[in-house]
Amino acid sequence: MKRKWWHGKVAYQIYPKSFQDTNGDGIGDLRGVIDHLDYLGIDIIWLSPIYQSPFVDQGYDISDYYKIDEIFGTMEEFDELLAEAKKRDMYIIMDLVINHCSDQHEWFQKALKDPAGKYGDYFYFRKGKDGNPPSNYRSYFGGSAWEKVEGTDYYYLHMFAKEQPDLNWNNPEVLNELYTMINWWLDKGVAGFRIDAIINIKKDLSFPDYEPDGPDGMTGIFRMVEGVDGVGELLEDLKKHTFEKYDAFTVAEVFNMKKDELEEFIGDDGHFSTMFDFSAHEMTFGDHGWYDAKKVGFDDLKKVIFHAQKECEDVGFLANIIENHDEPRGASRYLPDYLQNEDGIKLLGTISVMLRGIPFIYQGQEIGMRNCHMASIDDYNDISTKNEYAVAIDAGCTVEEAMEACYENSRDNARTPMQWDDSAQAGFTTGTPWLFVNPNYKEINVKEQLGREDSVWYYYQKLIALRKSEDYKEVFTYGKVVPMFVEKDGIFAYARKTEDQTVYIITNYSREDITVDLLTTN
């Protein structure tokens, strides 16, 4: 395996809108990130989108790829962030959203005026069939994936929200626009990108109908993605025109990859440096939506994590996560009631951070932030939460049942403001926060944990220091994961092993003390 500059690094995801507000407008900003660089003490910072956007989907609907949205600050402040990070040997990676853009982007506004013209071919405009959409796809956010252009026979494709039209990756002009933009950011000093929803860029241009999978008569658009070949050619072209030139670090968000494509994606010469391991998250998916989402226990977690590690051990590195901006808090999702405490959170952190791969820690994870129960669906900001609530109600759920699904699965669970201290609004802002602060901030906050050496925050610091220590960095970076005591109830254990060194990671997630025999284990 080729050794890369990013091997052995630890990453931290910042959701800027909820990280730290420094001007009192209730929205986190770049100055807040700069002010806390020394707090982090990690190597790579992934910034969720800060581009100009109408924020229908919290910045994943970009209206100008070359501008910082004014709610976050200025390009000068971004340049300052790059410079300050460099002083600390830290790397900044940005979110790259190139499957789609905002319907407010100049390209799409021009396309609406002439769907059959030049800019119409930047997107997927198709005429309807007998007064219906071109095909029966349900978008990832619910409802038809086709939106009718008022006053015409045309519809446009949007795999996500209707305000996020899909870009046409079959158009060389679109590719040139995107490659130029990516290289502009890399020239500026960005170290790489987290690449959003990238598997979706390849479409079956015949847009065939599929057998409906729900009472709405539609089928999930993932069916089309799974049925089409050739995405690898697009991804390789993307890499060669951009990332490869800069030795950039790239981490892909991939859900629909085919089983035999792992090496192609993250091998030594793969399309990307790494990709997130979503195997635990995928186990929670319901057949019809959040309202029938599945519970995942530690026995399930053990199986899928070990399976993912085994598949990857001779191929490349995974990006290991417990939570991110698109998922509920890991402590709330994975820990049983009896482990809803700091010991349980430390256990979960140990399992994840010490695995082979790149640990990605999401803001607030290092202090054990939890899900936040909102009183009403109106209190949620997330577009997918509102859509899933409607899906649950349409399926016959009561308001209470639909709200319970949101409590457990909403993306807003991870987007509540960072809890810095026990002052008003958790020290996040002096104004009114854009999203509710979790009421538990009095008990769970950074200031309290920095004053207590047995806290979750200090424990995460110790895990990171151990991974990066001179004595152990080789085994924790390149050592294989060897599952241990797999059949023993209540134990989640594995070894990190090289030819010269073995380290045991053993956790007990039961209610009882358990004895294991290390002398007889293989």
Short names for language-model regions:
Residues K2-N183, D187, N200-D260, G267, ...:
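Acidic/aromatic-lined carbohydrate-recognition and catalytic surfaces
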Residues Q20-I34, Y291, L335-Q340, F428-W434:
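Short, polar loop/linker segments at the starts of domains and inter-domain junctions
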